[in-house]
Amino acid sequence: MTVLHSVDFFPSGNASVAIEPRLPQADFPEHHHDFHEIVIVEHGTGIHVFNGQPYTITGGTVCFVRDHDRHLYEHTDNLCLTNVLYRSPDRFQFLAGLNQLLPQEQDGQYPSHWRVNHSVLQQVRQLVAQMEQQEGENDLPSTASREILFMQLLLLLRKSSLQENLENSASRLNLLLAWLEDHFADEVNWDAVADQFSLSLRTLHRQLKQQTGLTPQRYLNRLRLMKARHLLRHSEASVTDIAYRCGFSDSNHFSTLFRREFNWSPRDIRQGRDGFLQ
């Protein structure tokens, strides 16, 4: 597995923060690093396989990666990321207690993926741009300024994450997308889902199309197919079992949709004919 080292990304040995844009981020094999990072998805879509679990990521997704986590990107489509790198929560010169603002693992569950709405994403970009402008300066005031900006970024993300902000339709849509990640295999009635998240069906369609470029059903089908592709690569379950586990009641229909989406059959993926990078 590839290991990325801080010496190749941080501008100096005492820099606590570094900005690493990926515009775009291509498919990238599984790796880990000796630093931590906050991955901010600007726009586009892709699959982020994090510690073996696939997540669909789109504009507004924020992922917190620790130095012992392993992850990869696949099936990227114009996926643009900004990575905010930091050595460790306790390696800042002017800040202490940052762990309290970061996601915490509880009972083996780590809430690594958050979502923010478009207006918050704009504020995030402004903070990151300010940090980036100061990267070449190593004097104490500049270091303190970068660390203060990093603290502001953490506060903004925490206050604006879907866990703490459900006041507008954009935030409720983000919660809906997170719900689909956990319930993609369920039979989905869009009228009922819209009601569940206090959205009109028209608003759900419009905002989901704006955020992902797909209609709700098309997004759900792609999510199911991506989960199925991951299982084909990383499990021994039969194609039929995988189809059912991912929400398809007809394995033939599943195979047709799968080939249409990926230009490969499920059997091709199982046999590694697509040349996927391990």
From Swiss-Prot:
GO terms of molecular function: DNA-binding transcription factor activity; sequence-specific DNA binding
Keywords: Activator, Cytoplasm, DNA-binding, Repeat, Rhamnose metabolism, Transcription, Transcription regulation
Site entry (Interaction with sigma-70), positions: 241, 250
PROSITE patterns from the UniProt entry: HTH_ARAC_FAMILY_1, HTH_ARAC_FAMILY_2
Residues annotated as signal peptide: none
Gene3D superfamilies per UniProt: Homeodomain-like, Jelly Rolls
DNA-binding region: 191-212, 239-262
Role: Activates expression of the rhaBAD and rhaT operons.
PANTHER family: HTH-TYPE TRANSCRIPTIONAL ACTIVATOR RHAS (PTHR46796:SF13), HTH-TYPE TRANSCRIPTIONAL ACTIVATOR RHAS-RELATED (PTHR46796)
Subunit: Binds DNA as a dimer.
Name the record gives this protein: HTH-type transcriptional activator RhaS
Species, as recorded: Escherichia coli O127:H6 (strain E2348/69 / EPEC)
Lineage: Bacteria, Pseudomonadati, Pseudomonadota, Gammaproteobacteria, Enterobacterales
